C-alpha cells in the first residue's frame, strides 16, 4: 500500500486505497493534482458481547455512534476556515515553497508545475465558496491544504490534493 505524505510535515493525508480521478473532472489538472471520493462510515458502537447494550441503544445504535467521513477520520484531517484574502496569501507562499522544493529535488517538474498550477488555483479561487479546507495532523499552515467539495448531488465530499506537495511511502 502507498501512503501519500505532505512534503513539508510528513503528515499522512491519503493512500492508494482511494481511486484517483481527474480533479473536478478536468483532465488538464491531472498533471498537478488528483481527486478522491470519500465515503461515510459509522464509528463507535463496538459490541464485544459483554452485555446486550440495549439500554444504550437509540434506533438500534448506541449513543457513542457517530458518522464520519473516512478520509478525514483515517488521516486525522482537521477542517480550517480561510477568507478568500487569507487563502490567496497562503497559496502564493505555498506555491513558492513547492517551486523551490521542485527546483532542488525534481527539476524536471518545474515547468509543468509553473504552467499547470495557475489554472488549478484560478479554478479554486473562482469557486472558493464551494470548498472546505483541511489540514493534516500537524495542523501546520505551512503544509499543503486539502481541498474538499461536493460534486453534484453526492452526499460525501471529494478531496483534491496537489501532487507535487506530496511524496509516496510504501508499506
Curated annotation (Swiss-Prot):
Gene3D superfamilies: Metal Binding Protein, Guanine Nucleotide Exchange Factor, Chain A. It comes from Plasmodium berghei (strain Anka). Its main location: cytoplasm. The keyword rRNA processing does not apply. One of its GO terms (molecular function) is calcium ion binding. This is Translationally-controlled tumor protein homolog. InterPro entries: Mss4-like_sf, Mss4/transl-control_tumour, TCTP, Translation_control_tumour_CS, Translational_control_tumour_p. PANTHER family: TRANSLATIONALLY CONTROLLED TUMOR PROTEIN-RELATED (PTHR11991), TRANSLATIONALLY-CONTROLLED TUMOR PROTEIN (PTHR11991:SF0). The gene is TCTP. Involved in calcium binding and microtubule stabilization.
Amino acid at each position: 500500500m502507498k501512503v501519500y505524505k505532505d512534503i513539508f510535515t510528513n503528515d499522512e493525508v491519503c493512500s492508494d486505497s482511494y481511486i484517483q480521478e481527474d480533479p473536478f473532472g478536468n483532465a488538464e489538472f491531472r498533471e498537478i493534482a488528483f481527486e478522491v471520493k470519500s465515503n461515510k462510515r459509522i464509528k463507535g458502537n463496538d459490541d464485544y458481547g459483554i452485555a446486550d447494550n440495549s439500554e444504550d441503544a437509540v434506533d438500534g445504535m448506541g449513543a457513542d455512534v457517530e458518522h464520519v467521513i473516512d478520509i478525514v477520520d483515517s488521516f486525522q484531517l482537521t477542517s480550517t476556515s480561510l477568507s478568500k484574502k487569507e487563502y490567496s496569501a497562503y497559496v502564493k507562499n505555498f506555491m513558492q515553497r513547492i517551486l523551490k522544493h521542485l527546483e532542488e529535488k525534481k527539476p524536471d517538474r518545474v515547468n509543468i508545475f509553473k504552467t499547470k498550477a495557475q489554472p488549478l488555483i484560478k479554478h479554486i479561487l473562482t469557486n472558493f465558496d464551494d470548498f472546505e479546507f483541511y489540514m493534516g495532523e500537524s495542523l501546520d499552515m505551512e503544509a499543503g491544504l486539502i481541498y474538499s467539495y461536493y460534486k453534484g448531488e453526492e452526499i460525501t465530499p471529494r478531496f483534491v490534493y496537489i501532487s507535487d506537495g506530496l511524496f509516496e511511502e510504501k508499506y
